[in-house]
Structures are given as C-alpha cells and as structure tokens.
Design a protein with these regions (language model features):
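Active-site-adjacent loop and "lid" segments of alpha/beta metabolic enzymes
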Residues: 1-76, 90-175
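Conserved H-loop
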Residues: 79
Length: 175
C-alpha cells in the first residue's frame, strides 16, 4: 500500500482485508491481540482516504467491528474513512441479503458507505444466470443502496448506475 501511494500515485487505499493482510479479518474481534493493525498505522501516517471493508457475516458483528476499527483509525490520525459492508466476502447468500436489508443502520457511524454490488454472485445465484446477465439485479440493488444511505457505488455499468443515482436524487428532491 505504501509503494502504491508514494511511488505509483494511488490516492486511496481500498482494503479488503479489514485492516490486516495477515488474516486479521478472519479472526473474531474478541480474539484480536494486535492493538493497531499495521495497515491502520500506515493509513494514519500517510493521511490517505481509506476504504474499510468488513467480512463479518452479520450486521451486529459488522457494526461492532467497524466501531472498534474506526476508533483505532482515528486514534492514529486517519480522517477520510469509508465503510464497505463487503458484500460477497465472508458471507453466504442469505447473510448478504440480511445485511443489505438493514444496511441503513450503518449510517449511525456517520461515515460514507460504499456499496460494491455490481455483478456479484449474490445477484446471479438468486436470479439464475451469471455476471453478464445480472445488470437488472445490479441496478435494483444500487437503487436500494442509495435509498438506504450509501454515498458511493462501485460499478461496472456506469451509465445504468448514473441513471439510478439520478432517479433516487429526483425522488429525494436533490439537485
């Protein structure tokens, strides 16, 4: 991550390991012994925007983890923290949809939420087909995410995502 920021011009760290490339994401919160994961120290030092993804399979576990991890990041000087519920990571199909259904509860943490649902297996496994046939499901879930407070969408199909944003903005009377 350091090399990407300092030498290759990256502007943001998108961490799919929940703070630790050494597997901390798979260790239950109560069993984690490292006070501050190395990645968190790096983010605090470099002062770059940071996407913190969760692999927790329940919203309660995710909220608990995010609360602890956000505090650790802030203790180290991190400012621009973005939360990613990590759809498709560490969760089965039912768990993904249970978290999606209650995703607005993440807004209590007062940080932007990123949703990367585009073409995910949770769509095409439910509907049948594959990633190439999941555009309608992606658009539906993008729209729901926006209505539940997501501020950032990670997408493959930009035109369709922009249309979803415009429709939700019109519904919510945003200019």
């Amino acid at each position: 991550a350091r090399k990407c920021i300092e030498e290759w011009g990256a502007d943001i760290i998108n961490d799919v390991s929940e703070g630790g490339i050494t597997g901390i994401a798979n260790v239950p919160l109560e069993q984690r012994h490292e006070e501050y994961p190395e990645m968190f120290r790096l983010v605090g030092e470099l002062k770059v925007p940071y996407i913190l993804m969760s692999v927790q399979p329940t919203l309660a576990g995710m909220m608990k983890g995010f609360a602890k991890e956000v505090q650790q990041l802030r203790d180290l000087g991190a400012k621009d923290i973005i939360l990613d519920p990590g759809f498709g990571f560490g969760k089965n199909l039912i768990q993904n949809y249970q978290i999606y259904n209650e995703m607005e509860k993440l807004n209590v943490l007062e940080l932007p939420v990123l949703v990367g649902i585009s073409r995910k297996s949770m769509i095409y496994k439910l509907l049948g087909g594959d990633a190439t046939t999941s555009l309608n499901g992606t658009s539906v879930l993008d729209t729901i995410a926006l209505m539940k407070g997501a501020k950032i969408l990670r997408v493959h199909d930009v035109k369709e995502a922009v249309e979803a944003v415009r429709i939700v903005d019109a519904m919510m009377d945003k200019d």
